[in-house]
């Protein structure tokens, strides 16, 4: 049985690390543009549970996954292979 490396993107939602192309900040103009395009193409996945979107994960299938975790937090999780949920990383508002 093969082992898959996964990334917890918040609230128990996971993404296969091998499918991630990039992780970008959600507040740039280009991020907003590709987010609107993905929404119109039905390729937008919202994993924020209604919280503020802080990062956008782009996959190799051109799907966009919205996360409430910061880009830096997601990168740290990938680098350390640590997918435990720290309370300061998830916005509880």
Swiss-Prot record:
Family that this chain belongs to: Belongs to the RemA family.
The protein's name in its UniProt record: Putative regulatory protein LBJ_1616
Originating organism: Leptospira borgpetersenii serovar Hardjo-bovis (strain JB197)
């Amino acid at each position: 049985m093969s082992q898959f490396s996964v990334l917890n993107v918040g609230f128990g939602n996971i993404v296969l690390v091998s499918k991630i192309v990039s992780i970008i900040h959600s507040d740039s103009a280009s991020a907003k543009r590709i987010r609107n395009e993905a929404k119109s193409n039905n390729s937008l996945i919202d994993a924020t549970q209604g919280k503020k979107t802080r990062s956008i994960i782009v996959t190799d299938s051109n799907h966009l996954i919205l996360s409430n975790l910061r880009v830096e937090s997601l990168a740290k999780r990938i680098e350390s292979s640590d997918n435990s949920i720290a309370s300061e990383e998830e916005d509880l508002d």
